Amino acid sequence: MKMNKLFFGLLLQAAFYSGSLYAQADLRTDAYSIIQDAVTDIVCSSSTDAIQKEKRVIQVLNEKGKEDASFVCLCDRFSSLKKFSGEVRDASGNVIRKIKKSELKITEYSDGLVSDDYYYFFEYTPSRYPVTITYEWEIKNSDGLIGYPSFVPQKSYNQSVAQASYRIPV
């Protein structure tokens, strides 16, 4: 019985490994952008307070993927953007631009009647493709952590995901 479990585990590992290699080679097919890395870490300091650390590395392959180069962060009376940094690199890996928190725009537009929600956003339109954009930010949740944020690394159609992780240390 133990040998069957070991064999089954090795078989699953081999299938997963070969499948992931195939997927890596196939990421550009029909893709306008690729999420090279999406990391979400939730660090809870109490039952009502937490820090949400986010990192996104997005490679925009062509003009059809330019919407994926933008940054958007929703905040409300329970959550606020504490840290932000961004960086844009060209195809050779040279830094084209660094983005600071002070460059983000804020809008309080809401489709509802009354809302405390507001958005931080940054719109970037590349002049040449491909470009790789890295965004790193921290959101402080306080006075009411009802649940953990959802994890959806793929934000648009025709977008591939190379690597993504969601961690909640205990």
Language-model segments: what does each one mean?
Residues 23-170:
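Beta-strand-rich, non-transmembrane domain signature
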